[in-house]
């Protein structure tokens, strides 16, 4: 490690309070704490930058500063000597922190604003297969100490556990009061967004997935936001690792991942 882009410690707390002319007034306390570290690794091949962070409602639930520094160092040093790749079509594993972007695009596609504007690649897909059949996704707004927990949404509508995907089938949308009225549907308690999206974990950990894939790409970082929410076309810059014979072979950079989300979701 030759240098650092610095470290950040942030802590926030407050009260969300909402009232309306229907004699509703209520609120809840919230807090958010984060520690972040970014380092620069250098050798004869050049320099690489990476980092790590921990974020939680309860400060005591944060990773230790030592562990955050160690993970930032590991991630930066393992990127040294990164190579470029020729055009190819191979399986891809998205590391958990970057895989969240795939699900953010999904939530945007099933949000009321996208649907009533007819600007979604998942139009008219309710009760149809949109993910592989082993995928289950729920919204659980009442998880203790979770960052997205909330008793009601920005309209004052009570939140509740909400099944979005069951065995790959789209079961419901995410709607505010306004978008629900535009669509002639009932609000789902999602004014202001979703609260604690939970993707049911599979039976394999990352190492098992790498072994099963045998040859392909492990993506650990994404650049840009090349997603067309109307067509589902997906094209983003990426870096990560080339997998060969079920093992990490070497780091890669300056690559582009391209496809279409409708097909990507169904082939998870």
Question: What is each PLM-predicted segment?
Answer:
Residues 1-150, 154-160, 166-169, 247:
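Active-site bordering "gate/hinge" segments
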Residues 125-268:
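Dual-mode signal for accessory low-complexity, basic/Gly-rich regions
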């Amino acid at each position: 490690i030759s240098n650092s882009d610095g470290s950040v410690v942030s802590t926030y707390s407050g009260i969300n309070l909402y009232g309306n002319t229907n004699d509703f007034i209520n609120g809840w306390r919230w807090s958010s704490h984060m520690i972040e570290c970014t380092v620069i690794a250098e050798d004869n091949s050049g320099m690489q930058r990476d980092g790590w962070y921990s974020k939680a409602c309860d400060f005591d639930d944060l990773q230790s500063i030592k562990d955050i520094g160690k993970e930032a160092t590991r991630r930066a040093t393992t990127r040294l000597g990164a190579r470029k790749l020729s055009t190819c079509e191979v399986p891809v594993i998205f590391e958990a922190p970057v895989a969240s972007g795939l699900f953010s695009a999904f939530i945007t596609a099933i949000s009321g604003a996208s649907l009533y504007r007819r600007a979604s690649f998942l139009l008219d897909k309710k009760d149809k297969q949109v993910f592989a059949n082993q995928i289950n996704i729920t919204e659980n707004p009442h998880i203790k100490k979770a960052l997205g927990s909330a008793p009601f949404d920005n309209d004052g509508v009570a939140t509740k556990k909400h099944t979005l995907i069951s065995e790959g089938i789209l079961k419901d949308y995410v709607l505010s009061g306004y978008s629900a009225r535009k669509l002639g549907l009932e609000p789902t308690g999602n004014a202001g967004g979703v609260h604690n999206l939970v993707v049911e974990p599979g039976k394999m950990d990352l190492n098992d997935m790498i072994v099963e894939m045998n040859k392909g790409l492990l993506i650990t970082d994404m650049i840009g936001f090349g997603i067309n929410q109307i067509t589902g076309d997906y094209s983003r810059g990426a870096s990560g690792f080339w997998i060969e014979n079920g093992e990490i072979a070497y780091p890669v950079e300056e690559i582009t991942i391209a496809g279409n989300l409708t097909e990507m979701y169904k082939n998870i």
